[in-house]
Amino acid sequence: MADKYDVFDQLGELENTLNTTLTQISGIRQVLEASMTENATLRMELEKLRDRLAEFEKKEVKKETPKDQPNPNLIQIFNEGFHVCHLHYAERLAEGESCLDCLELLYR
């Protein structure tokens, strides 16, 4: 009779261990899904940036911009929500964020 109780105790421990493992697996799955979503977003942004770069390379701008006016290409990239400063170049700006390094580069 004591052996049956031991089996039940062991089954209870196994059940607890499996529940803990299942919780850990669910957490790992959520982290993986978030990483995959972020990866897909970053790949799309990278593709758009590469397309833009290809457009700029095709167009050979022969006009020189005056020194007192910022580079219109950098302004356009900045207005589309990307950093143009050397510290965070091509990283997406957060909603409503304004980077002092970018602004200094554009308007010095």
Swiss-Prot record:
Its cofactor is Zn(2+). The keyword Zinc applies. It is found in: Cytoplasm, Nucleoid. Binds 1 zinc ion per subunit. Its main location: cytoplasm. One of its GO terms (cellular component) is nucleoid. It comes from the Bacteria. Keywords: Cytoplasm, DNA replication, DNA replication inhibitor, Metal-binding, Zinc. Zn(2+) binds at H83, C85, C99, C102. One of its GO terms (biological process) is DNA replication. Signal peptide: none annotated. It holds the Pfam family YabA. Homotetramer. Interacts with both DnaA and DnaN, acting as a bridge between these two proteins. Involved in control of chromosome replication initiation. Inhibits the cooperative binding of DnaA to the oriC region, thus negatively regulating initiation of chromosome replication. Inhibits the ability of DnaA-ATP to form a helix on DNA; does not disassemble preformed DnaA-DNA helices. Decreases the residence time of DnaA on the chromosome at its binding sites (oriC, replication forks and promoter-binding sites). Tethers DnaA to the replication machinery via the DNA polymerase beta sliding clamp subunit (dnaN). Belongs to the YabA family. This is Replication initiation control protein YabA.
